[in-house]
Every structure is written in structure tokens, then in C-alpha cells.
Amino acid sequence: KQDRLDGYFTTHLTSEMSQYGKLSSPIYLENWYWFTHPDSVNKDPKKLRYGVVHGSYQANWFKTQNITSLLEVNSLEEIVNVLHHHRVDKVLLDLDDFNNAADHLGIDASAYPRSFYRYVPLGVFAANKLINSHPSFLEKFDETIPQCAPAPFYLSQGEQVQILNTLLEPIKALISQPIITDAAAQSNHIKLTNKALKLADDHWIKEVKTHQHDLAKNMLFTDASLYLKQWQRQFKGIITEIIVTDKQGKNVAISKITSDYWQGDENKFSLVYQQSLAYRFDSVEYDASTHHFQVQLSLPIKNAKGDHIGVINLGVDVEKALHSFNNNALN
């Protein structure tokens, strides 16, 4: 506020901060969950006692919510212990932090009902004066993040189970439909050389970058692609995109325009096609333009004989999915 700093690291963006600068792309993701004492599950929400670690990101968030029934402690293990002894009813913590602290204290973490709240991206906050004097700073900084950021962020086992419980069977039904298997099989009759694949991919990418989209639009209105879009609507934004490929990784059907034509050089294809996995989740990715977190879910497409003939990749809006599943569980 006093214009004395160019920025600071690491932080999350609050509504108060937004007028003073911008946040970089995430360097790290925190996975915030509500943890409730078992005896407080049915307690009147207006009477809940909350706990928080002093000076934490969660403490800053609580201030913005005007929650006054708040016990502040000095450490992560202390807040978990306070919940364990029922001095508070509910805490908001990163999932891994809670599990690790509970394990260190010899507390059974699974005994505490939990519900997903949100992902919190942590990055470098650049003040307006830094951005004004160095307009390209954030763009260049964001480009270097993959080289120095921690390991990719993956869904927890419990989160994967939640998503699969809702999506796996409908996806299996989708990829068994003749309109999908026939499209993949027909494309497999046209095998391209590596050189031809590269040329086709480059052509597609060039068109997308120049907003031509001729190749992509032609594919977007095939029967198989239209079927994907119709199927996708039932999930009300949880599924953000669908790509069906043949056994070479070439696009066969798409629910929206994709950035490239050939998926064969990407993990979402190569680690699923002709492999033993029934499905695969990729790492969670952050879309800075939409502020959404997405994960790719991939499954092999098989013919009636059980042979692999392609792969389906689905983009899943993780926050929307987990919130939806939590709400359904409560109803």
C-alpha cells in the first residue's frame, strides 16, 4: 500500500491485494480442506468454533470472512492436536499438511470428516510499480517456473476415487459406442509416416495460432465430435474438453478446438495406449486465463476383441468436480 516493495514471495492473491499488483502463475499449489471433529458434524454452523495457525494463509482468509469464533495457535501440529481434543470444531488446512501432522502426532487422520474447499495457487506477487517499469517481468518469470518449481501436483487417492465414482462408468459407456469406436477404427486405416504426422500437426498448430481453424472446425462438426459435445453437456462444466485419438495419437473427434492435432508424443497418450492401465490421471494444471484447475483423465479405447484402437482424453475441472461430489454426498 505504501509502495515500498516491488513484490514478495510466496503468497496467494486476495481481493485486497488485487488493486496493488498481480500474482505470477503458481509455483506451488495448496489443497485446502475443511476438517471437522466427528462430534461436531451435525452442530449448528452458527455455533461452530474454528481453529487456525497464526500468520498462515488460512488465517488471512478467515479475516476476510469476518469469522470471530476463532482460536489461533502457533503451529500446524498444535492446531491438529487442538481439533483432536475437541477444543475447536473445524479447521481449514492443506490436505498433506493435515495428514502429515496427524501422522506425526499418532492421530488417525481418517477419523476426521473432510470436504474439499479449494486449490490455492501460491506465487510471486509483483507490485504495480514493478510491472510498470518492467512490463515483461511476469511473462518471463512465468516461463521459468517449470524449470524451478517443485514436482507436479497430483490428485490425492481419495480425490481420484471421488472423480472415478462419478465419471468412470459413463466414460466407459461412451467409448463403447459404435460412433466412437468406428471413428477410431476408420482413422486407423490411414497410417501416416512420422514426417506426415509432423506436417499435419504443424499445419493444425499454425491455423490455430492464426485463428484460421479450418482443419479443427471441419473435425469439430463431424458426427463423432457432435456426439462428444452432446454427451459432455450432462456434466455441467465438470468436463471441459474431450479428445478421441486413434492408435497413432491423431485427433479423431474433439469437443472443442485443440491446440494441436497429434497427441502421440504426450503422456496422456503414450502412458495409456497399449499399456496395462485402465485409466490415468495427469498432474493438476492451472489455467491463468480462467483461474481454473484442470486434470487430464485418459482411458484406452478398445474394439470388440479387446484390442487397443485409440485413447480418449478428458479435461476435468477439479474444483467444480470435487465441490459437486461433496454437495451430492451431503444431499
Language model segments and positions:
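Acidic, polar ligand-binding/catalytic clefts
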Residues: 1-47, 54-56, 99, 110-119
